[in-house]
Amino acid sequence: MLRGSLRSMSEHNYRPRGGGRSQGFSSIPSTQQAHSAGSQGGAHANHGGHGESGGHFDLAQSALDDMHAAGFKPEFGPGVEEQTAAIEKALAQLTPGPGVEDLWGLGWSSIDNDTSRDLDQIEVAERVAGGVKLWVAIGDVAAAVEKGSPIDQHAQAQTQTIYTAVKNFPMLPLELSTGVTSLNESGDRQAVMMTFTVGPDGEMLEEGVSLALVRNRAQLAYSRVGPWLENTAGGVVDDDVTSLRSDSAREHAADESMTSVGALGKDWLVEQLKMQDEAAQALHAARVKRGALEFHKSEADPVVVDGRVISVSEAIQNRAMNLIEDLMVAANGVMARALRKGGRSGLQRVVKVPVRWDRIVALAAEHGITLPAVPNSVMLNDFLEVQRRVDSVHYPDLAVAVIKLMGPGEYMLMRPDDDPTGHFGLAARDYTHSTAPNRRFPDLVTQRVLHAMAHGEPAPYSDADLTAIAAHCNDADKALRKIERTMQKRVAAVAMASHLGEVFAGVVTGSSDKGVYVRVIQPPFEGRVIQGEQGLDVGDRVTVKLLHTDPARAFIDFAKVGMRAVGPSAGNASPAAGH
């Protein structure tokens, strides 16, 4: 799927959309009826009709070739199959062990993409004196995958699961990540659990981290819960929560009776979602007050069937996605503080102060706003919110530019006595990655550190080990992001091959000795300006003509047509007629 420039702020557990995420190395089968990843959440504007030309290009093979060329070995090595079978057998029957709470009976639920099978987290809420208490349970991968084992070696080498529109490269065997370590509906699982109470002002109280036995009672979908929370979808929630359950949950339910609310009561899901949403909004408001940046994201979402690009849609983040984002950001903070309090070193996830703050200041000045010379996230977010309200048409241009100028996140050693580097974009002082161990190696590392702390055991990793892991994950992330960007361009090159000569509105997202790059607004895709690029800088608004596409080389070439004015008076920023 095309994620493009918006990924850099996705430091929470919100996962990328992508059809066939559970298909491993397979492309999306035709039996999914041209299922778009975009149907998994958010509102969509379809820019179809891009698709049949270029369909002969083997996108799936090109993704695999790119992985190999970058030095990755996505195929699992010797010993993995045997280890996987042993883990499946061991986890077939679970009983609470020492220090593991039995919370099977709580009303746990999940919200994720429609086709997701590698579910990392489930949630449950309870109204208590002073606010809403949240339990966030994360699949306990560390309890299943031994450090140094064949599966662990593969996970550490690849560092994460890679999702593209046509081929996924899982970090863990699918029998684990979509099976016995996934929190799919109706399965008993061991989990790492973060608890915290959220007050009306969004402040977090009574934090804790522990181990628990859990069961997901309702596997829900962003695409259904979002409109329901936003009051844009009619109807009520059924007793078996069919109206909000994901496609995947319904397709894989061995016994539909297991999904009924039963003794939990008819209205439990409605109350759960309302409480979770209330807490999430309070958490979000508090983070914004501290300086968290709000980017109202939209993403390109290609429809790919049997490796052929059929069309490109625009997917917009909805309220259900925001709910999960805010709860996971909070849970990651709880974990980071628990490790610090326990005197344990771990990995922190940081976004440093923007190196190109001066360019952000210049962009604000173009809109008549003065930002201070010293980076200030509160004032930056105020500026972004004002622009979103007064100039929603051009807001995507600005958001893309600022995200690019923010720079990427990275991992660093987090010693208990060190002053945290912090996460500039999330306004988080203590922050780690702990909520996606099925698909991110640093999260698995964090779980192992927690297990050792919980059982009074020596640290599984030395500070030197953690420093090396952080460096490797940062290097791998850069290489894997390059592969993703290349695949995004290949998919877009196929999709846009029939639109040569057309003019589009866009914003400059990259400017260096390597070239000038522009992201088109609708449909979202990125290419290089090869004519008239002189003098362009990140954030400049331009109109460009599509000159050439070459999926094999991942080339999309533009010619600059002109500059676009800043602000509401700039006129129509939409692409040429027909788009």
Predicted segment positions?
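Electropositive polyanion-binding surfaces
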Residues: L2-G4, S10-N13, R21, I28, ...
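Short, compositionally biased
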Residues: F558-P568
